[in-house]
């Protein structure tokens, strides 16, 4: 495991402990169970694909460890509405504060400003975070194979499903993908960014494609910056994209989405 990932996970363990001290598990579970029903994340992606359109999970991200602040003028509700107008299928919203300058409040504001299903993009390691995700309004969570042992990953998926949420499982290499494919979720994310080096290569998705059956939805993540990148993926049958930085650097994120996926 990379130094940056290990550092992030240590922060997450501390955050879970602090969260439990602030809001006990039973209370967080009650909040999750009382939340408004989840929106259909997988259904929204399939609807775009069935219509012959690329399904875009548009990301709302202020900063990252590798790039620093990406968007200084950061208004999550306006960005969410812009993405919906631009044709996004779903949203991905960073809630990690320490490394990505994210917030649960950003997720709540963005979800309230549109009708799109929302992914809580964070480093999930504990059941507490899954209850927390549903309580804040998330419709889907991210599970990163590099960050989790298989039994823990399977348990977190089961809990998310029990609460009505979808799961996007993320892998980066063949060994991680083998673990990811043991989960029930159809959403198989392939991160083109190596979390150990932060280098990006679209070949990561293309090389792993043959291992994934047609019943799954392959989500290519990171490095989609130009229409040629989209064309490369679609020509190989990849029609679901998670894109953040290319949109966040544009004056009008939704217009950039519409342009990139025209």
Swiss-Prot record:
GO biological process, one term: L-tryptophan biosynthetic process
Keyword field: Amino-acid biosynthesis, Aromatic amino acid biosynthesis, Decarboxylase, Lyase, Tryptophan biosynthesis
Record-level Gene Ontology MF annotations: indole-3-glycerol-phosphate synthase activity; phosphoribosylanthranilate isomerase activity
Gene3D superfamilies: Aldolase class I
Pathways involved: Amino-acid biosynthesis; L-tryptophan biosynthesis; L-tryptophan from chorismate: step 4/5
Keyword Membrane: no
Enzyme Commission number, as recorded: 4.1.1.48
Disulphide-bridged cysteine pairs: none
Catalytic activity from the UniProt record: 1-(2-carboxyphenylamino)-1-deoxy-D-ribulose 5-phosphate + H(+) = (1S,2R)-1-C-(indol-3-yl)glycerol 3-phosphate + CO2 + H2O
Keyword Repeat part of the UniProt annotation: no
Pfam family, one: IGPS
NCBIfam families linked to this entry: PRK00278.1-2, PRK00278.1-6, PRK00278.2-4
HAMAP family recorded: IGPS_B
Family, as annotated: Belongs to the TrpC family.
Protein name, as recorded: Indole-3-glycerol phosphate synthase
Provenance organism: Thiobacillus denitrificans (strain ATCC 25259 / T1)
């Amino acid at each position: 495991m990379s130094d940056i990932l290990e550092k992030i996970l240590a922060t997450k363990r501390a955050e879970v402990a602090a969260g439990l001290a602030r809001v006990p598990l039973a209370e967080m579970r009650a909040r999750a169970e009382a939340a408004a029903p989840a929106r259909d994340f997988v259904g929204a992606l399939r609807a775009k694909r069935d219509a012959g359109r690329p399904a875009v999970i548009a990301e709302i991200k202020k900063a990252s460890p590798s790039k620093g602040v990406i968007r200084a003028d950061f208004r999550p509700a306006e960005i969410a509405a812009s993405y919906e107008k631009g044709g996004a299928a779903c949203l991905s919203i960073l809630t990690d504060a320490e490394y990505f300058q994210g917030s649960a409040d950003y997720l709540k504001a963005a979800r309230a400003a549109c009708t799109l299903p929302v992914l809580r993009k964070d480093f999930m390691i504990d059941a507490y975070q899954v209850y927390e995700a549903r309580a804040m309004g998330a419709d889907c969570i991210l599970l990163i194979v590099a960050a989790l042992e298989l039994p823990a990953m399977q348990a977190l998926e089961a809990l998310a499903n029990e609460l009505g949420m979808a799961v996007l499982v993320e892998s980066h290499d063949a060994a991680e993908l083998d673990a990811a494919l043991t989960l029930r979720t159809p959403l198989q994310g392939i991160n083109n960014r190596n979390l150990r080096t932060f280098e990006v290569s679209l070949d990561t998705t293309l090389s792993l494609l043959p291992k994934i059956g047609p019943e799954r939805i392959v989500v290519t993540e990171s490095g989609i910056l130009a229409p040629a990148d989209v064309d490369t993926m679609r020509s190989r049958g990849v029609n679901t994209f998670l894109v953040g930085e290319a949109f966040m650097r544009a004056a009008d994120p939704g217009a950039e989405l519409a342009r990139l996926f025209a």
